[in-house]
Curated annotation (Swiss-Prot):
One of its GO terms (molecular function) is ATP hydrolysis activity. SUPFAM superfamilies: P-loop containing nucleoside triphosphate hydrolases (SSF52540), TrpR-like (SSF48295). Its main location: cytoplasm. This is Chromosomal replication initiator protein DnaA. One of its GO terms (cellular component) is plasma membrane. ATP binds at residues 174, 176-178. Domain I is involved in oligomerization and binding regulators, domain II is flexibile and of varying length in different bacteria, domain III forms the AAA+ region, while domain IV binds dsDNA. Residues 86-129 are annotated as: Domain II. It is found in: Cytoplasm. Residues 130-346 are annotated as: Domain III, AAA+ region. The keyword Cytoplasm applies.
Amino acid sequence: MSLSLWQQCLARLQDELPATEFSMWIRPLQAELRDNTLALYAPNRFVLDWVRDKYLNNINGLLNTFCGADAPQLRFEVGTKPVTQTLKTPVHNVVAPTQTTTAQPQRVAPAARSGWDNVPAPAEPTYRSNVNVKHTFDNFVEGKSNQLARAAARQVADNPGGAYNPLFLYGGTGLGKTHLLHAVGNGIMARKPNAKVVYMHSERFVQDMVKALQNNAIEEFKRYYRSVDALLIDDIQFFANKERSQEEFFHTFNALLEGNQQIILTSDRYPKEINGVEDRLKSRFGWGLTVAIEPPELETRVAILMKKADENDIRLPGEVAFFIAKRLRSNVRELEGALNRVIANANFTGRAITIDFVREALRDLLALQEKLVTIDNIQKTVAEYYKIKIADLLSKRRSRSVARPRQMAMALAKELTNHSLPEIGDAFGGRDHTTVLHACRKIEQLREESHDIKEDFSNLIRTLSS
C-alpha cells in the first residue's frame, strides 16, 4: 500500500502549520489507504478529537486538491494501523517506509550483573527508578501556562515510545517541569509495574559515566542506560561543555530511539539556545515534541495555593489566596514556599490566616518583589529587548515596531505590578485605561496565535522576575 498521498498531505501540512502544532497533532497520525478510504489512526481519543475538530477541513481540502473527484473518504480511529510488516524506524520519520525487506533491529539482552556500582560480573542491571511517587498528574494544577505540556506528558505516559519521542519540556525554574517528569514515570509504572523507568538529574548521568570510566566499566554503563524503557533526565543544560558526557549521551539517545524507548528531557531554555551543547544533540532534542511551560497566570496561581492548602488540611480564604497570587508571580516553587511560611507562622502563633496576617508574615518577600518589578523597570527591559528607546514606548507613534512592544510592556505591567489600568496608562504617555485594556487583550490573543509573541512574553517575564 502506497502512502504517497498521505506523504503529500504531510508535506503541505508541515508547510502550513506551526512546527509545534504539526509535531503535537499531525505527526502522531498513522495512515492506511484502502477501498478509497483514508483511515487516520490517532494514539488516543484526545488527539483524535482535536485533529477532527481543528484540522478536518485542512485534510479534506488537500485530498480534494490532490485527487479531485476521486478523493478518498476520510475516517478517524483510535489505535495503530494494522501491521502487515515488522519494521522499526526512528520516531522522527514522519511516515513509515514502504519497503518490506528491511530486517527489524533486535535489542541485545543485557548480560547479567548483580548491581551497578560494584561491577565484577555481567548481570541484569538493578534499576534505580528515583521516581517520586508524590508527583502525579492528579496533583499537578493545570492552567493555560502548562496545558500543552501536561497534555503531551499525559500522552507519553499512556503511550511511551510513541509519537512524542523525545519529549522536551523547557521553562524557568520552579514551573513544574520536574513534577511532570515524575508524573510520567508514575503513569508508565502504573500501567506496567515492571517497566524500567529511570529519573535523574543530568549531573547524575555525568557522575555515573565518570565512575564507570574510573572502574573500567563503561560497557556496563552503556548496557544500563540503553536497556531502560524510559529515561527521564532533568536540566539537560548541565551537559554544556562536557564533551565526553555529550558523546556518550549522543549514542545512548540514538540507541533508545531506535529501540522505541521513551526519552524525556527538561531544560531552562529552548534547545537551540543551550550554549556548549553540540549541534547534533540539539537537533535530536527537536526530533519529537518541544513544549514550553510558562509562568502560571493569576487564576492558576490561586488554584495552586488552594490545592496546596487543602493538601495540608488548612482552610485558606479565597481573598488571601488571591492576595498572595497577585503579588508573587514568578514560579510555583516561590508560591508554595510563601504558603508554607504563612502556615508555619499561623501554627506558631495560633492566629487566623487573614490578609493582614499574610502581609506581616511575608513582609520582606513582598517588599523585595515590589522593589524588583516596577513600571520603569518594565519599560527599560522591554525597550532593550526590542532595541527601541523608552521614549518610543511613551510616544504617540503607531508603527508596529513600536506599538507591539508598547502593548507588551502594558500587558507586563498589568501582570507583574499592582498598579491599576489608569495608573499604567498614565505611565505610558497619559493613555486612557481602555487603551491599556485593549493592549492586554491583544497580547493575550497573540500569545495563543504566535509562537514568537509567546516566547517574547515568557522571556520578558523570566527576565523581570529573576
